[in-house]
Structures are given as C-alpha cells and as structure tokens.
Amino acid sequence: MREPTVRGRYYEDFGVGEEIVSGCRTIGEGTIDLFAGVSGDFSEVHTDAELMKDSEFGERIGHGILALAVMQGLMWQTNYNTGTVTATAGWDTLKFRAPLRAGDTVQAQWVIKDKRVSASRPTLGILVEACRLVNQRKETILTGEHVLMVRRRPAAT
C-alpha cells in the first residue's frame, strides 16, 4: 500500500494554545432520523415529535452521540490532520451541555491544550484538544478533550 497524501499538519506544526475553527453544518430532521437508524437508538426523545412537544425540550432532539459525530466530522473537514493523523486515542471529559435540535447550525471549535511525544512510539506525537460544538445561538452543545495521535515530521524522528 502507498503512504497517504499529506495535506495536514505534523505534530511539530501544532502549538499549545492554538485555536482551530471549522466550517458550519445545519442539522436537519433527516440527519436525526438517519442517525437513529444507524445507531439503533430509537428513543422517543429522538423520534417522537408529538410526545416531545410537552417535554422540557418542547420538541424532539438529536442524539448526544450524533453531536459528537458531527463535531468530529467538522474537525476532519478542516483537513488540519489529513494524512498525518493515525488514530483517536480517546475522548475524555465528554459533557453534553445543551440539546442538539433540528435546524441548528453548528460549528466545531478547539484549542490545542497539550502535546507530547509518544513514549512507546517515538514517530508519533499525542495532542490533547479541548473541543466544543456551538450552535447559531452561541450555546455550547458539548465539550470534551480529544486525544489524537499524529505523525511526527520524518526528519524529527
């Protein structure tokens, strides 16, 4: 197999405190429906508009994990790590702060919180990104720390 084309940035190119912002995406009713089908989570909070009219939300809402998936997709679409990322090592301190609603336009925003060279794999660096997904009302939908493994520049290893 061939090596991936590198359009993204290597570990050395990131600075602690650097902020990165994605483009925007509007969430439709169909997105919520499709995610229910993919995930198998058909909970009425996500699928029953009539029942949810009288809930604390006033309408059905998107899945929390859908919000996470959308945020990760928005992050990927910036191409900040295309060809240099090797894996997501995990999501820490994930918190759902506000509901994701059909019609919301959302944006991913993140800051490089920490970085270190992998002790076990010196060709890789580990980035800790403090991430949040915000909507058009400037409400934070979710927050979390994304731990990402990124290739180091070949000359740096």
Regions found by a protein language model. Give the residues of each.
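HotDog/MaoC-like acyl-thioester-processing domains
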Residues: 1-16, 96-157
